[in-house]
Amino acid sequence: MVHPRFVFFAFLALSVLLAVMNEDSILSSNKGDSLCCNDHPEFGICTNKSCNKWCLQGCTRGGFCKRKICHCYC
């Protein structure tokens, strides 16, 4: 029979692993590299149509021009 302590630690390790792998997690390693919820001055000249299309490559809600800078929705 499997020891209950082993099951608890396996469950805990799996939970931590899934928390780190989830893109929306606060523990995510690629939070700064995310398109969503960020301004992107590297995009260049901003038009709402082109900014929205560019943001849809990594965000489900698209984006808009915020003070002449492309901003992707959260």
Curated annotation (Swiss-Prot):
Report if keyword Signal is assigned.
Answer: yes
GO biological process per UniProt:
defense response to fungus; killing of cells of another organism
Q: Which UniProt keywords apply?
A: Antimicrobial, Disulfide bond, Fungicide, Plant defense, Secreted, Signal
Query: Taxonomically, which superkingdom?
Result: Eukaryota
Its cellular-component GO annotations read: extracellular region
Q: Where in the cell is it found?
A: Secreted
Pfam families given in the database record: Defensin_like
Primary residence? secreted
Transcription as a keyword of this entry, yes or no, is no
Return the InterPro entries for the record. Defensin-like_20-28
Q: Which residues form the signal peptide?
A: 1-19
Q: Family membership, please give it.
A: Belongs to the DEFL family.
Q: What is this protein called?
A: Putative defensin-like protein 27
Q: Which organism is it from?
A: Arabidopsis thaliana
